[in-house]
Each structure stands twice: as C-alpha cells, then as structure tokens.
Amino acid sequence: MEAEMLYSALALTFAIFMVYRILSNSQDKRSLTKLPPSPPGWLPVIGHAHLMKNLLHRTLYDFSQKLGPIFSIRFGSRLVVVVSSSSLVEECFTKYDIVLANRPQASVDRRSLGFSTTSVIGAPYGDHWRNLRKLCDLEVFAPTRLASFLSIRLDERDRMISALYKISSAGFAKVNLEAKIVELTFNNIMRMVAAKRYYGEEAEDDEEAKRFRDLTKEALELTSASNPGEIFPILRWLGCNGLEKKLAVHSRKTDEFMQGLLDEHRRGERQNTMVDHLLSLQESQPEYYTDEIITGLIVALIIAGTDASVVTTEWAMSLLLNHPKVLEKARKELDTLVGHERMVDEHDLPKLRYLHCIVLETLRLFPSVPTLVPHEPSEDCKIGGYNVPKGTMVLVNAWAIHRDPKVWDDPLSFKPDRFEIMEVETHKLLPFGMGRRACPGAGLAQKFVGLALGSLIQCFDWERTSPEKIDLNEGSGITLPKAKTLEAMCKPRHVMEKVLRQVSNV
C-alpha cells in the first residue's frame, strides 16, 4: 500500500513538474541559461541528488574539475551553487558579503544541533543576528572572558597529560588518542559553560553525565544524517519522515537538559561560568536574553566548539605520526623556547611559529567543515559572471580551495614549512569561513588545538602502532572526522619526567 502511494505521489509530482516546465515564460528560460554550468545526469523530481556520494566535498570537487570553479546542481527542486576557487570566494565575501550573509532556513527542527533562528550559526541576517553576534564577540568570546577561563584549560590539559603519563610511565604504551582528545575538549567547554565535567573516570557512572554524553553522541550522528524529506517534501505527506521525528525527540530532550542546567544555576550561587554570566544579562534585559536565546548560544558553542577542535587535533597528530621529521622540528622549537622545567602555556603560543604552521597546514588539508556553513543570497546577484538567484543555497568548497594547485605548491603534501615563508590570505585559507558570517569562535578553537598539540609533543615520544602509516581516510559528517579512531604508542620524554611527576602527583 505504501509503495503504491509513493508511486502515485511521485507520478503526480512529475506531472506537475512537467506542466510547470512547459508553462515557464521565456524570461525564466533566459535566466536559467545564465546559471553556472551543471553536471549531466539531472532527473525530474530528484535533480542531481542521486549523484551525491558519501563524502559530499569530494563529489563536489570532482564536479569542479569538469565544470570549472563555479557550477550549479539541484537537490530535488532546490538550486545549489558551489564555489571552488579562492578568487570567487573573495568576490563573494567582499562584493556580496551582505547579500550572502543569510543562511538557508531548514524546514525541520535542528535547534538541538546548533542550527536555528535563535543561534548565531543559523539565524537569518538582520538585527537579531547582529545582536547575537555582538553578544558572542563581547560576552562569550571576548579576550577578557576567555582569559578568565585559562585555569580551566590548563587544568584539563594537565589531567590529560597526567592520564597519559600513568598509562605509559613504564615505557611505550598504546593509547586511544581520540578518546583523550574528546575528554579534554568536552570537559573544557562544559566547565566554561556550566562548571561541569561529563567525561572521565569520575563521571563514568554519573546519570547527568550519561545523559549529556548520550545527547552529544546522538547530535553528532544526526548532523551526518541526510533528510530526504527536505529534498522531496512529498515524502513528508506520506509519513516518510523518520529523521524529522528523531530530530524532534532530540530537540525536546536537549531543551529539557538545558533548562535543567539553567534552573540549577538560578538556584545556586553565582559562579564564573557562561551560563551564570548570561543569566545575569537576563536579569537586566529579560525581554531579549530569554532562556531560548541562552540555550541556542550554549548549544551552538558545545556542538561547533567541540567537534571541530577534536577532529583538528586528531588530524594533526595523525599527520605528525606520518611525518616524524616535522614532529621532531616542532619538538625542538618547544625545547628551545619553553624548555624542560615547565609545560607549554597559552602565552607561549604566539612565539611557537612552527607549531602554528602545523595547525594551519592541518586546517588546510582537513578543514573541520569542508563545505563551510551554507549561505543564501537575499537578492539576485552575479558570481563569476553567472546568475545566482535569490534563495539559492551557496556552498563554498573550502576543501577543494585548500587543495588547488593554482593556489598551493604541492597541495596534497603535508608541508607546514610553507607557512613560514608565505602570508596567510583569508580567501585562500578559510577553515573558519570568511566575511561577517565567519566563525566567532575561531580564536578559542586555535587556543584549544595549539595548547593540546604543544603539550602532547613536548611531554611524550610518539610512534605509530605498526610500521604502516596512519590511515588518513575521511569519515562522514558535517565536520570531517577520521574514518578510523587514532591510536598511537607514547612514552614520557626523559627530560620532562620531573614536570610530569609534578603534574601527576607521583
């Protein structure tokens, strides 16, 4: 019965579509001829959706090699324009920065994933978004605010280093680096947000921590899931909306969890947390700083701020394990500028130029969000001489731009040294986006990654678990995780033994 209904609905949709095509006026047809080129294989109703493979950024890269630096595809009836060159990105976010400052509005509830009209990531461009961005810049990511959380970042770093030392104090031991980096990053964020630690041995059996870990795991799974109902709305009419139901349930559970956090902080003594600070702002401006606004900000920070830092640190360590000479050069820089009597600190990071080059090269090869967050023009515009109508989804394939041989010498190779002699231009290296919708948390993410990476290099010797190189295959998702969990062999460096014993209280 369901199959018959689906067939009838698709047949009806096809018929309506063909009538629309026949009745389209000539001006519309002339406008369509000025769109960026499209790949062959378009089909009625589904467009080019059947051509999309698991790793979207690679599929789009393949299209760009045949069609050029700007092309168009159809996800169902939705027009999507893909930009894959640094010069066109510069045009987009200088000439058309305001026009492209909008976000496509999802037809399903994604607020528990950080993409909603109440979050700085997903809000449409306008006064509301400007207020959210100002709030992020002045209250959440302000240098003084981040400096007030420095002790948390150092303490979580010390906990990770101590755990690794206890595992490997007798000699080389295999460690699950991904798990350690996840624990470091999520505990960092949640202590800043609400003075909570939800990962680690002491939180293993805590019910609240379990709820948070389950919600986070579900969120990361849902971000990588596709929703056919957004491409083919008719499927919703037929009840084929399993993902939408999962998102609705996840949003409800996330709202309940976050409301519990807010209520707990209202009842308790004021602390140096982001939740407490936002609640204090709510007292003076309750009409704006609603619980919904605060929840949207916090959820976006948790989802966007953690996963990107985790995958970047994991990719960096994977690349270093495959390039021991680069690892040794970074270690020598740390030994020279920091020494062996203390651990690297955040105030050292500006001096550690080669370490910064490693982070930049990692972000070049494996940008945490390879196609960035989509944009949507608020009016018709032209990009690269082609028409881009209002309401089009515009994707920037940062992954492709970062591997463009016209921009980068030997683009597929891991060469941090390239950044020692070249100036970074934002339209060529854009892991955090560009223009007014660029990621507001880029500075915090780089602090996380730089401190974690520097500490791992300074304190331990690292080797691969086998002679084979680390697998650099990419996993699926909105972010760019490794396909395989990173495991490595580590042992304490002899010259850091004294410091490691102090950190580990042994």
From Swiss-Prot:
Pfam families reported for this sequence: p450
InterPro entries given in the database record: Cyt_P450 (IPR001128), Cyt_P450_CS (IPR017972), Cyt_P450_E_grp-I (IPR002401), Cyt_P450_sf (IPR036396), Plant_Cytochrome_P450_Monoox (IPR050651)
TM regions (residue ranges): 3-23
Main location: endoplasmic reticulum
Keywords from the named record: Endoplasmic reticulum, Heme, Iron, Membrane, Metal-binding, Monooxygenase, Oxidoreductase, Transmembrane, Transmembrane helix
This enzyme's EC code(s): 1.14.19.74
Localization annotation: Endoplasmic reticulum membrane
Gene Ontology CC annotations of this record: endoplasmic reticulum membrane
Cofactor: heme
Topology term for the membrane: Single-pass membrane protein
MF GO annotations: heme binding; iron ion binding; monooxygenase activity; oxidoreductase activity, acting on paired donors, with incorporation or reduction of molecular oxygen
Enzymatic reactions: (+)-piperitol + reduced [NADPH--hemoprotein reductase] + O2 = (+)-sesamin + oxidized [NADPH--hemoprotein reductase] + 2 H2O + H(+); (+)-pinoresinol + reduced [NADPH--hemoprotein reductase] + O2 = (+)-piperitol + oxidized [NADPH--hemoprotein reductase] + 2 H2O + H(+)
Keyword Membrane: yes
Tissue specificity statement from the Swiss-Prot or TrEMBL entry: Expressed in seeds and leaves.
Binding site for heme: 439
Enzyme class, UniProt record, top EC level: oxidoreductase
Family: Belongs to the cytochrome P450 family.
Function: Involved in the biosynthesis of (+)-sesamin, a furofuran class lignan. Functions in a dual catalytic mode. Catalyzes the synthesis of (+)-sesamin from (+)- pinoresinol by formation of two successive methylenedioxy bridges on (+)-pinoresinol and (+)-piperitol, respectively.
Protein known as: (+)-piperitol/(+)-sesamin synthase CYP81Q1
Lineage start: Eukaryota, Viridiplantae, Streptophyta, Embryophyta, Tracheophyta
